[in-house]
Amino acid sequence: MSYTTYFLAFQLCVTLCFSGSYCQAPFFKEITILKDYFNASTSDVPNGGPLFLEILKNWKEESDKKIIQSQIVSFYFKFFEIFKDNQAIQRSMDVIKQDMFQRFLNGSSGKLNDFEKLIKIPVDNLQIQRKAISELIKVMNDLSPRSNLRKRKRSQTMFQGQRASK
């Protein structure tokens, strides 16, 4: 991973903080520490454009945006995992990870455990691949918006009933 990637990733952290209803000075301080550590303020970092910011602009609806945010948060959690033994930046990463945890998962430790469990699943393991394929039908069914489909059918039935009674 290049320093450009690191810089753009931390730029997203700053952007997320500005979009929040509150921002704490320690959060900015920790990002500054990470920027210094990764030398993320050099002129070559923006080369190639933003890492996440342009993608976030394309996702407007809140429910859709949650999908892309989950992928971005997953990236950061993996990123922090790589450097977990680095004492120079450990505190900074912990502060930022905790803030992401509060904002994205509403402080639910159960959700955090599930989220971390998912991002740690290795996709190159044959047994994991077999389990994933075995569960695919149920996962696909869970992804389909059943409640909206029922509401739509009810609305169509009511609308057809109104037209028939005229």
From Swiss-Prot:
GO terms for molecular function: cytokine activity; type II interferon receptor binding. It is found in: Secreted. The keyword Secreted applies. Released primarily from activated T lymphocytes. Glycans are attached at residues 39, 106. GO terms for cellular component: extracellular space. Transmembrane segments: none annotated. Its main location: secreted. This is Interferon gamma. It comes from Sus scrofa. The gene is IFNG.
